[in-house]
Amino acid sequence: MTLFEAIMLGIVQGLTEFLPISSTAHLKIVPALLGWSDPGAAFTAIIQIGTLAAVLMYFWRDIITIVSAVMKGILKGKPLESNEARMGWMIAAGTIPIVVFGLLFKDQIETTLRSLYWISGALIGLALLLSLAEWNIKKHLSGGRPLKTMEQIGWKEALLIGLAQSIALIPGSSRSGVTITGGLFLNLSRETAARFSFLLSLPAVFAAGIFQLYKTWDIITASPGNIMNLAAATFTSAVVGYLSIAFLLSYLKKHTTTIFIIYRLLAGILLLLLLSTGTLLP
């Protein structure tokens, strides 16, 4: 991998991690289209530390408030006393499913499920689910019922959105896509679903990135070029990811996710056509 390729993949990661279009799919598809080598599951997980940094930078006030409230609640023996403390525990609860499924299906995630056929199916499948979730929101609003805010996320919402996040272990599904979809099915507002999705990503993405960094440390440090490429890709993904978060939260205040549904459908269908004609290999 050249430095240019690493920077380009960092841009792809930053652009697609938070938009509901799947960063893993694009990190697999873009190199295939350009004739580059597959960066692999480890590279993908490690540069997600960059987008993790983007979440930390964007939500640093929220994160400090949540962590502080959780600690105060524990010390006072009232862990759910404040909304901020409750949110901390909701994030923890929502993280449990992806940890369990990630450990159970780690080998399949890193091998079989990285096939472009799986990715094309996931792109199309989640587009259909997201369209159903949008229909649910419109139906809910047409009945004159308000959508839920961050303060109204409880154990049920946290665990179900956490289960939805587990689907993101399938490349092409999109972690933000499945969690936002889950949130919409549970009648969260689009902005609330996205905001909770981003905060929920912190523990899982951090754990996956650190694990892959530890597992591949010898390979990374074997060449200065490897270190430079990973550093460049991670830094780039952090900067671009920050801008992507700001864009999506602003966009969802006034718009639906229709544009992303259409994009996923077109990308999935195009990918299937390229595979069927032999232009791309799975």
Curated annotation (Swiss-Prot):
It catalyses: di-trans,octa-cis-undecaprenyl diphosphate + H2O = di-trans,octa-cis-undecaprenyl phosphate + phosphate + H(+). It comes from the Bacteria. Its EC number is 3.6.1.27. It is a multi-pass membrane protein. Bacitracin is thought to be involved in the inhibition of peptidoglycan synthesis by sequestering undecaprenyl diphosphate, thereby reducing the pool of lipid carrier available. This is Undecaprenyl-diphosphatase. GO terms for cellular component: plasma membrane. The keyword Lipid metabolism does not apply. The keyword Cell wall biogenesis/degradation applies. Keywords: Antibiotic resistance, Cell inner membrane, Cell membrane, Cell shape, Cell wall biogenesis/degradation, Hydrolase, Membrane, Peptidoglycan synthesis, Transmembrane, Transmembrane helix. The chain crosses the membrane at residues 40-60, 85-105, 115-135, 153-173, 193-213, 230-250, 258-278.
